[in-house]
A protein has these predicted regions:
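Domain-terminus/edge residues, biased toward the C-terminal soluble/receptor-binding domains
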Residues: 187-419
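Residue-level preference for short coil/turn positions at secondary-structure junctions
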Residues: 12, 37, 361-364
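Structural motif marking the loop-to-transmembrane transition
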Residues: 4-8, 63, 114, 118, ...
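A short hydrophobic/aromatic micro-motif that marks alpha-helical segments and, especially, helix-coil
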Residues: 20, 83, 145, 224-225
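Active-site-adjacent loops and short helices of periplasmic peptidoglycan-processing enzymes
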Residues: 26-197, 207
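Sec-dependent N-terminal signal peptides of Gram-positive bacterial secreted proteins and lipoproteins
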Residues: 2-28, 419
Length: 419
């Protein structure tokens, strides 16, 4: 009996230890990120560029309609540069009308003579993934299809991306041949080939160029000239794969037989805008939800607030300007440690500002660098001027009769104004 009691006591102790250790074991397991069941994946903080996950991230793969992200970026860039307006109206050429009526490649049928604004075409490309809309955007921006594809490849090269484009829509040459959209000197089955890292960075640049693009991409349906269009992003609210904890509000889906399912998602965690891409999967939406959940369990965010402040426009000069940061906070992701952040704000004037001697409202004037002192990971946030300022005062001419007060006043001015 005594021996039995001892054994029961041992068993009870073992059970108690197991109970105590169980949560720790579960917590450790929850911080593991499973391999994504797809060809490639990439996740980054859109504000800082910090990478949270990558899988075959630099290898080029077909990306289908994710290609439209670069098409829309270049459209927004042209608008921001004043070369194009959201309200500009166009009618569709005959080959794109034909494409819009193709059962296999169309999500929005268009009529001869029907007018579309640039904003409507962007909505059609982002929400319904309209191939005709995307192709027309390219022709509006560059003048014709071939010139726009060249612009896409030049932009990719400028950003150092692993990418090569032959279409603005994401369709392959085998699809484009019936619509007079195949570029000269390209193969009959050639297609856009882009890495997961590359298209994620394109999405990052699009968010910077137009932070409101998610207001378009998050719409599950919309109406264009009385025709309803629908979003294939199943992770949006009200859709079959929607998960509140994921918080996905965009951005673009894609599918061709060669590319399989592709998805670039946008979501926010603790105020930080995130971008995640999965290429070439069969269950991309559920895989994206799982990836986001696991990354939230693995990483924590250390943030520091950023507020408006006076920025000295040059070292040692009295000229200052009030500037506002482009984000209310900066943050660094970390795991299994306590981090320490250091913030440094530096004046950053452009050659054009220095040449003209003027800073205008909205101009970038400084850059905050928030650094994790333990890992060196850093995030940079731009400060933009809230007011106009003159860098250089009127030139001062010294004579033998210059008074002491005049000399002292001049010494308080920028050095460049003294000569």
């Amino acid at each position: 009996m005594v021996l039995l009691k001892r054994w029961l006591r041992v068993i009870a102790i073992i059970g108690l230890i197991a109970t105590i250790l169980a949560p720790t074991t579960a917590q450790a397991a929850s911080k593991t990120v499973s391999k994504v069941p797809a060809r490639a994946a990439y996740v980054m903080d859109a504000n800082s560029g910090q990478v949270l996950y990558q899988q075959n991230a630099d290898k080029r793969y077909p990306i289908a309609s994710l290609s439209k992200l670069l098409t829309v970026y270049l459209t927004v860039k042209a608008i921001n540069e004043g070369k194009l307006s959201w309200d500009e109206e166009v009618t569709m050429p005959s080959n794109l009308l034909k494409l819009s009526h193709s059962y296999a490649y169309s999500s929005l049928q268009m009529k001869a003579g029907e007018k579309f604004t640039v904003k409507q075409l962007v909505a059609a490309a982002m929400i319904a993934s309209s191939n005709s809309a995307a192709t027309e955007l390219g022709e509006i921006v560059a003048g014709n299809n071939a010139k726009f594809i060249a612009l896409m490849n030049q932009q990719s090269e400028d950003w150092g991306l692993e990418a090569h484009f032959i279409s603005s829509s994401g369709l392959d040459n085998s699809d484009l041949k019936d619509f007079d959209l195949v570029l000269p000197d390209t193969g009959k089955n050639e297609q856009n080939l882009v890495s997961a890292k590359a298209i994620t960075k394109v999405a990052q640049q699009l968010l910077k160029a137009d932070p409101d693009i998610t207001k378009i991409a998050s719409q599950t349906e919309a109406s264009i000239n009385g025709t309803k269009i629908f979003n294939e992003n199943s992770c949006l609210p009200g859709k079959s794969q929607y998960k509140k904890d994921s918080g996905i509000d965009g951005l673009k889906t894609g599918y061709t037989e060669n590319a399989k399912l592709c998805f670039t998602a946008t979501y926010t965690v603790n105020g930080q805008r995130m971008v995640a891409t999965i290429l070439g999967g069969d269950t991309t939406f559920s895989a994206m939800n799982k990836l986001i959940k696991q990354l939230k369990q693995k990483y924590s965010l250390e943030t520091t607030p950023l507020t408006a402040q006076r920025i000295a426009l040059a070292n040692g000069l009295a000229t200052t300007v009030t500037a506002t940061p482009m984000a209310s906070q900066a943050g660094v992701w970390y795991q299994d440690k306590t981090t320490s952040l250091e913030t440094k704000v530096e004046t950053k004037l452009t050659p054009a500002q220095l040449s003209s001697g003027t800073v205008n409202v909205g101009d970038p004037v400084a850059q905050a660098t928030v650094t994790d002192t333990q890992t060196g990971t850093a995030q940079q946030i731009t400060y933009r001027a809230d007011q106009t300022a003159t860098l250089f005062a009127e030139r001062v001419v010294f004579t033998a009769k210059s008074t002491t007060d005049q000399l002292l006043t001049a010494l308080k001015q920028p050095v460049a104004s003294l000569f």
